[in-house]
């Protein structure tokens, strides 16, 4: 039986969108709340709950007496694949099938031997949970996991529809220069082009699942008692200010992986992780044998898929650069096929390259051997790179990765973009420039400046540190 002191704890139920890039920051935030004395209920879908057990072992989800894991259905058919589920499929299914199980879980928790649920922390694109918050009379904070610039861009989807920029007239608009159209009317986004908007605008169908999903999700922004963003003011102030009109309670509390310094001493939390793929820890030992700033780190994240031809072009570009590299390539990265890297590539690069399927990216990016990050420009990857002072070569795939790429290359001056139609010569040239060239040196220095500002944001008295304190006291613990 729980003690009186235990039963009086605030109880946060945390529910991420069921993809790796959303689960990680939600887990980091949940650990911070736990450090502040909250009882935590962390809710995955059934599919990812099972994947966590497979990747981290059955004990990974045992949690703690005050940090529990639960799962609810998402309405999709069962699958044993080691891959991210269909994003459109999830977006269509979750709002229809997850609300009642989520409400049932809250009711069960409220009737059990744990403190009653006192607040909901929901992913910003899981706004169906607001109906549960209303039903149980609970405050709900919406955690939007993209960058602030990506978040701002999503909030203008409705304007793009109303002004008839989208949907596209026909598929020729994807290649005829139309996406270069400059939009000078969006506050906080100077010189932004259609191509820099999150990719779900690239449709000719007004009923497109993803376009409509974000139109609906952004309409829910004012309904959260607060919005949290995994960024810091010095980096994205210009993108945050315009969104305050939609919800004045916006808290920038990132980089969240750096905020973990306040909970790292808690041994009880060490076994609680969120990687859905089994990590290869040997890559750190390999990096230990390399000189500072000598290794190209390549990782296109948990969702990106590419053609076999693109995979081969990236491979030979890396090989021809003659630089050491660590390449993380998921088995499912080539759409519908097992990722097969040519044997002759492996032979050519065996002395200077390591290829593996997954790693602890935070550990890799803070390793002194890493000189540049070849990335898909997902936000977790981007902010982890920024906060470790590592410049980037950007190959955005979908969602707000296009926006992040634009800001890295133009606003923050820490990145070069590779064309979607990737060619080995361009990969080789950009790797050499970033590792040896004058532009690369300038971007490295700029990245180190941003690293310093990120460290200041999360230090005691820094902007993100204070915002987290205010969020807890003024929102989550407010009676």
UniProtKB/Swiss-Prot annotation:
Checking CDD domains in the record gives:
GT1_Gtf-like
* Originating species: Stevia rebaudiana
The molecular function terms of the Gene Ontology recorded here are: quercetin 3-O-glucosyltransferase activity; quercetin 7-O-glucosyltransferase activity
User: What protein name does the entry list?
Assistant: UDP-glycosyltransferase 85A8
InterPro entries membership: UDP_glucos_trans, UDP_glycos_trans_CS
The superkingdom of the source organism is: Eukaryota
Q: Which UniProt keywords apply?
A: Glycosyltransferase, Transferase
Name the gene: UGT85A8
Which range is the signal sequence, renumbered to this chain?
A: none
* Family stated for the protein in its record: Belongs to the UDP-glycosyltransferase family.
Q: Does Metal-binding count among this protein's keywords?
A: no
């Amino acid at each position: 039986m729980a003690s009186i002191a235990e039963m009086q704890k605030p109880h946060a139920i945390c529910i991420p969108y069921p993809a790796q890039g959303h689960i990680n920051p939600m887990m980091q935030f949940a650990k911070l709340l736990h450090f502040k004395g909250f009882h935590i209920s962390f809710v995955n879908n059934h599919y990812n709950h099972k994947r966590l057990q497979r990747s981290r072992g059955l004990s990974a989800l045992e949690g703690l007496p005050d940090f529990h894991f639960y799962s609810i259905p998402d309405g999709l058919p069962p699958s044993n694949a080691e891959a991210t589920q269909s994003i459109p499929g999830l977006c269509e299914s979750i709002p229809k099938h997850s609300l009642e199980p989520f409400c049932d879980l809250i009711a069960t928790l409220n009737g059990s031997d744990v403190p009653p649920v006192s607040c909901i922390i929901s992913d910003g694109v899981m706004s169906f949970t607001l109906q549960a918050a209303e039903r149980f009379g609970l405050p709900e904070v919406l955690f939007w996991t993209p960058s602030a610039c990506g978040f701002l861009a999503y909030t203008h989807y409705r304007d793009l529809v109303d002004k008839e920029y989208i949907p596209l007239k026909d598929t020729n608009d994807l290649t005829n220069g139309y996406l270069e159209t400059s939009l000078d009317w969006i506050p906080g986004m100077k010189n932004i082009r259609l191509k820099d908007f999150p990719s779900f605008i690239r449709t000719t169908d007004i009923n497109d699942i993803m376009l409509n999903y974000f139109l609906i999700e952004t309409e829910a922004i004012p309904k959260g008692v607060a919005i949290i963003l995994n960024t810091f003011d010095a980096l994205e102030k210009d993108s945050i200010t315009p969104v305050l009109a939609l919800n004045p309670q916006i808290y920038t509390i990132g980089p969240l992986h750096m905020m973990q310094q306040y909970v790292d001493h808690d041994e009880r939390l060490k076994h609680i992780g969120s990687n859905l793929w089994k990590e290869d820890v040997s890559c750190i030992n390999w990096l230990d044998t390399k000189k500072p700033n000598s290794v190209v780190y390549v990782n296109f994240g948990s969702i990106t898929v590419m053609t076999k031809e693109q995979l081969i072009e990236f491979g030979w570009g890396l090989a021809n650069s003659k630089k050491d590299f660590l390449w993380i390539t998921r088995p499912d990265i080539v759409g519908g096929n097992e990722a097969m890297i040519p044997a002759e590539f492996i032979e050519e690069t065996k002395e200077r390259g390591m290829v593996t399927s997954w790693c602890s990216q935070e550990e890799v990016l803070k390793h002194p051997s890493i000189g540049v990050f070849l990335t898909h420009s997902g936000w977790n990857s981007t902010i982890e790179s920024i906060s470790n002072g590592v410049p980037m070569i950007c190959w955005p795939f979908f969602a707000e990765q296009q926006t992040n790429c634009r800001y890295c290359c133009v606003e923050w001056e820490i990145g070069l973009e590779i064309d979607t139609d990737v060619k080995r010569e361009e990969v080789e040239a950009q790797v050499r420039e970033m590792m040896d060239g004058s532009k690369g040196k300038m971007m490295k220095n700029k990245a180190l400046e941003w690293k310093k500002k990120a460290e200041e944001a999360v230090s005691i008295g820094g902007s993100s540190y204070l915002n987290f304190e205010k969020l807890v006291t003024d929102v989550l613990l407010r009676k």
